[in-house]
Swiss-Prot record:
HAMAP family: Ribosomal_eL20 (MF_00273). Belongs to the eukaryotic ribosomal protein eL20 family. GO terms for biological process: translation. Pfam families: Ribosomal_L18A (PF01775). It comes from the Archaea. It comes from Pyrobaculum neutrophilum (strain DSM 2338 / JCM 9278 / NBRC 100436 / V24Sta). InterPro entries: Ribosomal_eL20 (IPR028877), Ribosomal_eL20_dom (IPR023573). Keywords: Ribonucleoprotein, Ribosomal protein, RNA-binding, rRNA-binding. GO terms for cellular component: ribonucleoprotein complex; ribosome. The keyword Transferase does not apply. The keyword Transmembrane helix does not apply. NCBIfam families: PRK00773.1-1. Part of the 50S ribosomal subunit. Binds 23S rRNA. This is Large ribosomal subunit protein eL20.
């Protein structure tokens, strides 16, 4: 069952970030953040430092996208 993870860190340029993603495991959440931050800001994995990964309840989540994904109980493909 997917959970919402809040990943906190900073980049080599000094930019701090807090991203909420849905994932099965903390490792998957970190991989997704590396992909998102790296593609948005043209950074490699070495330039992204992850400080904290925590499970967040849907009520505590700040990201509307993460809340909506947790509300979906099934996906139908036509």
């Amino acid at each position: 069952m997917p959970r919402i993870y809040r990943v906190v860190g900073e980049t080599a340029t000094g930019m701090r970030f807090r991203v909420e993603v849905t994932a099965e495991k903390p490792y998957d959440a970190v991989e997704k953040v590396y992909s998102l931050i790296g593609s948005r800001h043209k950074l490699s994995r070495v330039q992204i430092k992850i400080r904290e990964v925590a499970v967040v309840s849907p009520e505590e989540a700040r990201s509307d996208a993460a809340k909506l994904l947790m509300a979906v109980d099934r996906v139908v493909r036509y």
